[in-house]
Structure formats: C-alpha cells, structure tokens
Amino acid sequence: MQIAPIFHKVFRELYGEPCWNVKPGYGSFFTLEFGKPHLDVHEPTVASKDASRKVRRLLARRNIFVHGEWHLRIASCAWEVLSNGKHVGNGSTKPSMRRAADLLDGQKLIRFSFLPEKAWSVFEFDLGATLRTVPYDRKGE
C-alpha cells in the first residue's frame, strides 16, 4: 500500500527506532517514546487563591518527566495490539493496556500505513507486534 507523502515525511525518522517507556495514560490514551531521552522539568507554580488544597500542593512541587525526541500518543480512538496476528491488549482495561505496553516496549517501528477509506492506522514493529487504530465511530472521524 502506498502511503501519502505527509505520513512518509513524519514517520521516516522513526523507522528503525525502538519505542520505550510505553505506557497507558488517562482513559484509553496510550503513549510511546522514540529517540534520545531528555528531561522535561516543570517548576513549581503558585496556584490561584480559589484553588483547592490538593491543587495548591501539586502545583507547589517540581515535576520531572522523561520524554523521547518523538512522543507518539494514541488517543481519541479505539486501538488494539497484536503479536504475530494474535490479540494481546487494547484500551478496554488497564491490565489489557499494560499487556499491550509490555509487548511493544523495546520494539522498533518498521512500517506505518493508513487506510483513508476507513480511517484506520497500522503501526508494525520488528519483533512481530502490530498496533492498529480505528475511529470510535464513523461520525468521530
């Protein structure tokens, strides 16, 4: 399948790169890091007067996150991870998401394809994993 030039331009730098720190996020969000790691430091800030005690406490902390040169977030869609064609996990439950993350972690992205007529995306990895995304519904495309 021929991939549109814009997708080739975006993904060509990721081909052959191992993903790391693959993890479930909020809801069914799913993130993968690629490339050299760097620290993202969020300095403490002062909350507004009407902020709750919990918010004030959280904003008073310094938060440090490790990110890659490229950050791929799978969000606002249904997704599934397969290993050599067999279902491993999806966004339905945290344990299912964790199984999917564990399988993908360390695998190298080798191919991306997009099926515009169905709005499906397919990410293929070197050790047999496949990550497929589909819209939640046709109206949500």
Kindly give the residue locations of the regions a language model identified:
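Surface-exposed, interaction-prone regions used to assemble/regulate multi-protein complexes
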Residues: 1-141
